[in-house]
Amino acid sequence: MRNIIKLALAGLLSVSTFAVAAESSPEALRIGYQKGSIGMVLAKSHQLLEKRYPESKISWVEFPAGPQMLEALNVGSIDLGSTGDIPPIFAQAAGADLVYVGVEPPKPKAEVILVAENSPIKTVADLKGHKVAFQKGSSSHNLLLRALRQAGLKFTDIQPTYLTPADARAAFQQGNVDAWAIWDPYYSAALLQGGVRVLKDGTDLNQTGSFYLAARPYAEKNGAFIQGVLATFSEADALTRSQREQSIALLAKTMGLPAPVIASYLDHRPPTTIKPVNAEVAALQQQTADLFYENRLVPKKVDIRQRIWQPTQLEGKQL
């Protein structure tokens, strides 16, 4: 079995999902990742980047959520990171010099609004007047806002409670909030613990997906290298399908979560390929940014197109 895995990894390192030109590796790459960043976590665990770029010092920094990660990116503590759709909008509004370098399609089943199993709240419309916990400026913020709009409610119709995932989980379990908007693997952990009910997931909410962000100077200097790094993340993510059981065991160990939680998480998010941000994705992200501005959740309008980095080696529709 070990030989099979080694052969699979060797094959991954020889294939690129991005059209990567000849790469010159920088001296270092500092990567920000989250517990739920499957492709990144597997790439880190298998040391795929370290093997592909032995001349570069690869370092990894874990963050609890996207907003904290992009703060680190803005102050120069990391070079590259992955977040949901909302953190880069808040970061751009705050003046961060970052660029979008890649996107994954949305995984609507991996992000939800939870309520207690015996809660009288049966629909999103029932959230009116209730306390809802979530990480401010995260993709769950967008999930909640879009779900409220779909149900005919305004953001001001609820009592938002801004908490990190860990603090939100505690508040939810203690009954201090009425609902919790959250993403995986926190969602799967709560689901398997029991006593919760999914009020709404991301289906039909037209979210953008997850983005890969880089400091602009780093991206401009290391374009081909970044393409290769993103291709490696996609290849690592594919292991969840080709080597599912081994990936579950490895992720359970590295994330410190039970294997059933990881299995549930993988069921919610099929592996996908990271792609360049095209005009269609940029337009959808602009709609999201405008929605947040209209609800006075960001201080000013932002132009997403100003922050889209396009690898010149790729063919297809450019911005």
From Swiss-Prot:
Pfam assignment, any one: NMT1
Gene Ontology, cellular component aspect: ATP-binding cassette (ABC) transporter complex, substrate-binding subunit-containing; membrane; periplasmic space
Single Gene Ontology BP annotation: alkanesulfonate transmembrane transport
Domain of life: Bacteria
Keyword Signal appears in the UniProt entry: yes
One GO MF term: ABC-type alkanesulfonate transporter transporter activity
Keywords carried by this UniProt record: Periplasm, Signal, Transport
Location relative to the cell: Periplasm
Leader sequence segment: 1-21
Described purpose of this protein according to its UniProt entry: Part of a binding-protein-dependent transport system for aliphatic sulfonates. Putative binding protein.
Similarity annotation: Belongs to the bacterial solute-binding protein SsuA/TauA family.
Name of the protein described by the UniProt record: Putative aliphatic sulfonates-binding protein
